[in-house]
Swiss-Prot record:
It is found in: Cell inner membrane. It comes from Neisseria meningitidis serogroup B (strain ATCC BAA-335 / MC58). InterPro entries: ATP_synth_F1_ATPase_gsu, ATP_synth_F1_gsu, ATP_synth_F1_gsu_CS. The keyword Nuclease does not apply. Coiled coil: none annotated. The keyword 4Fe-4S does not apply. Belongs to the ATPase gamma chain family. The lineage of its organism: Bacteria, Pseudomonadati, Pseudomonadota, Betaproteobacteria, Neisseriales. This is ATP synthase gamma chain.
């Protein structure tokens, strides 16, 4: 029964793995709900900042703020690449990196260089492995990242845009659609689009004029940074919700596969045991007949 013992050992091994994947599935489900709630709570702030900034930009057209310049010749681009710090989340990071690298290659074919800020160790390792120009990064952000962890890398990139050392900035991340679907997204963060500060931007429901202290221009300059930071944080929240959803689905699939493997191994074990019993009975019958 040496074969039978080996099969039982395999069954116990798969059962232990199944317990781990089941626990990871449950943890991911809990974390996904929390990240979804954080994502939902962050939206009203970002929308209100965008509305006030749009109102100020439309009433102060001669603002002279570099971050609001809309037309530039593109010579150098920046990327904010958001990925997860951990794996076991299906093809989530691979899909984002595929979209990101395709855009980088397209720019390189035009002779345009890139500068990259990475949030998440998976994206950072991928960029370093192929020799891309990573200028700043932040990893090990945890389940509830603080804005302070993002400010250093973001400030450096925004300052380079203000100095005309970078002419466009892309934001790349995994967008959360629903539990079963996450999609890689690439958005132009800078220059800020017409849908944010142009005629198609959201309008305030009130028609009266506002009085700003110290000045409308000072408030606008402050709000532009806060708006950009809120967009990046919202993308990070989306990416984290996508990560937990993808991990939950991946761990459920692994748990189900482990269950199927256990069933197959039990069937093989029962067949081998039945064959061994049949052989023993045949030997007993043959021995009795010989006597």
């Amino acid at each position: 029964m040496a074969v039978g013992k080996e099969i039982l050992t395999k069954i116990r091994s798969v059962q232990n793995t199944q317990k781990i994947t089941k626990a990871m599935q449950m943890v991911s489900t809990s974390k996904m709900r929390k990240t979804q709630e954080r994502m939902r709570l962050a939206r009203p702030y970002a929308e209100k900042v965008r509305m006030v900034m749009s109102h100020l930009a439309q009433t102060n057209t001669d603002h002279g703020i570099p971050l609001l310049e809309s037309h530039r010749e593109i010579r150098r681009v920046g990327f904010i690449l958001i990925t997860s710090d951990k794996g076991l989340c299906g093809g989530l990071n691979a899909n984002v990196l595929k979209k990101f690298l395709a855009q980088v290659q397209e720019y390189r074919n035009q002779g345009i260089e890139e500068e990259i800020v990475c949030f998440g160790s998976k994206g950072l390792m991928a960029c370093q492995s192929i020799g891309l120009n990573v200028v700043a990064s932040a990893v090990n952000l945890g389940d509830t990242p603080k804005m302070e962890m993002l400010l250093g890398p973001l400030t450096e990139l925004f300052q380079r845009y203000e100095k005309h050392e970078i002419d466009r900035i892309h934001l790349v991340y995994s967008g959360f659609v629903n539990t079963m679907r996450q999609e890689p997204r690439m958005e132009v963060l800078l220059p800020i689009g017409e849908n944010v500060i142009g005629d198609s931007a959201p309008k305030s429901p009130f028609s009266w004029e506002y009085r700003y202290e110290p000045t409308a221009l000072a408030v606008l300059e402050y709000l532009v940074r806060r708006y950009l930071e809120s967009v990046v944080y919202q993308a990070l929240s989306d990416n984290m919700a996508s990560e937990q959803a993808a991990r939950m689905v991946a761990m459920k699939a692994a748990t189900d596969n482990a269950g199927n493997a256990i069933k197959e191994l039990r069937l093989v074990y029962n067949k081998s045991r039945q064959a061994a019993i049949t052989t023993e009975l045949s030997e007993i019958v043959a021995g009795a007949a010989a006597v």
